[in-house]
């Protein structure tokens, strides 16, 4: 650290400090128990699935010629067997419809699992909604949620977002939804 300071060097890819997107809106529906309890490993494909939402910004030119920030929301579903994204939705607003459509695709892709599946998320409002929890019950899928404010309970997904942003997002400026 001191050598870096003496030489006047600065690491740009770790210096971004912006407010992290939070989908938590209090208790708006059913909060499930933390069934995974940080046991992320599985030897069975499609048995344990985790999800979360992350926010990305892109910049468009405003009427006055100044850049205006716009947001994009990424909702992936990851199979914990080999850390593969099995479905996702990208939208300009955090929407239950987008999360629900990615959920439907994740249910379809993981339907070949011979054991009862577990879908894990944080306590975001979309994951507490009646339509979300009802859909999981219809498919006999266990719902698991992280404890409030504890990112370690979904650390695999948080790590994925960190790596993704490190590789393609931080240090770059995107000028359209399509470019990002």
Predicted features, each with a name:
Residues 70-71, 88-112, 128:
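Active-site beta-loop-alpha junctions of metal-dependent nucleic acid enzymes
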Residues 4, 36, 52, 83, ...:
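Mobile genetic element proteins and their domesticated derivatives, centered on retroelements
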Residues 1-44, 150:
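Basic, flexible linker segments flanking DNA-binding modules
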Residues 128-138:
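Active-site/catalytic core of tyrosine-dependent DNA strand-transfer enzymes
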Residues 21-23, 27, 121-123, 129-130, ...:
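RNase H-like two-metal-ion nuclease catalytic core shared by retroviral integrases
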Residues 114-118:
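Catalytic core of bacterial c-di-GMP phosphodiesterases, primarily the EAL and HD-GYP domains
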Residues 38-86, 92:
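An active-site-proximal beta-strand-loop segment
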């Amino acid at each position: 650290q001191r050598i870096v300071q003496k030489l006047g060097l600065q690491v740009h890819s770790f210096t971004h400090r912006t407010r992290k997107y939070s989908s938590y809106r209090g208790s708006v529906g059913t909060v499930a128990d933390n069934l995974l309890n940080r046991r992320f490993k599985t030897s069975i494909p499609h048995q344990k699935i985790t999800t979360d939402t992350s926010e990305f910004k892109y910049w468009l030119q405003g009427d006055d010629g100044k850049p205006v920030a716009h947001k994009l929301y990424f909702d992936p579903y990851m199979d914990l067997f080999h850390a593969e994204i099995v479905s996702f939705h990208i939208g300009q607003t955090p929407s239950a419809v987008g999360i629900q459509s990615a959920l439907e695709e994740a249910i379809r892709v993981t339907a070949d699992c011979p054991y009862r599946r577990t879908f894990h998320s944080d306590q975001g409002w979309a994951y507490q909604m009646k339509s979300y929890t009802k859909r999981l019950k219809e498919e006999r899928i266990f719902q698991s949620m992280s404890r409030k404010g504890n990112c370690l309970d979904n650390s695999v997904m948080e790590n994925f977002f960190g790596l993704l942003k490190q590789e393609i997002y931080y240090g770059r400026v995107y000028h359209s939804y399509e470019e990002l």
